C-alpha cells in the first residue's frame, strides 16, 4: 500500500510539472503597438493611403482576441512622432523575458525610417535606429517589427532576403513589405494591403504547415513572400531581416 501511495505521489508531482512547463510556454504577455496612417497633416507631401487604417485595425483586432495581449492602436493625428515613441518606450519597457513585443506600422516609408502624422522633412520621421534602440532595450526575447510602407526595405542598409544563419537570440526580427526602392502595393477596393492581408492569413493558421499550432518566423516568411510577390505581379518583395532563430514563434494559432 505504501508503494502504491508513493507511486501516486510521484505521478501527481510529474503531472504538475508537465502542466507547469506547458503553462510557462504560453504564459506570456504580447505587447502590440499598431500604427496606421491613412491621412497626414501635409497631404501634398504624404498623400492619403486607402488601406493603412484597415491594416492597423485588423492587426489590432487579431491581437485583441489573442490570449495575454495588450494592444495599443495609434491612428492618423494620434500617430505623431512624439506619441509613437512615447507609447513604444512606455509599453515595451514593461515586458519581461518571457513576453513578446510587436510593432506594426502601416503608412508612408522613406529610406531609413517611417513617417509620422506631421512629417514634412527628415527631422520629423522616426528612424530605424530609434525603433531598434527601443526594441533592444526591452527584456522580451521575441521582438518583432512588421512594416507595411513603401521603401520599407531601406529601413536598414543591411536589409537582405531571408538568412537562416541569423540565429542570435534576443534580437529584433524586422519584416518589411518591400525591398529598398520598391513601392508597397495596395488597392482602393481592398480593406488591407497585400502584405498585411497575407500576414493575417498566416497568423490565422494558413502558414502552419506542420500543424503544431505555432507560426514560426520561417513559416511566416515561406507563406507570405511568394503570395505577395504573386499578388503584385513581381513588383513587391517582402524582406525578413535580423538576427533571430528561424524557429522563433511569432504567434500561436487558436
Report each predicted region and the residues it spans.
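Bacterial N-terminal signal peptides that target proteins for export
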Residues: 2-13
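Generic extreme N-terminus detector
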Residues: 5, 22-23
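Bacterial N-terminal signal peptides
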Residues: 12-22
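Cysteine endopeptidase catalytic domains of the caspase/legumain-like
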Residues: 23-254
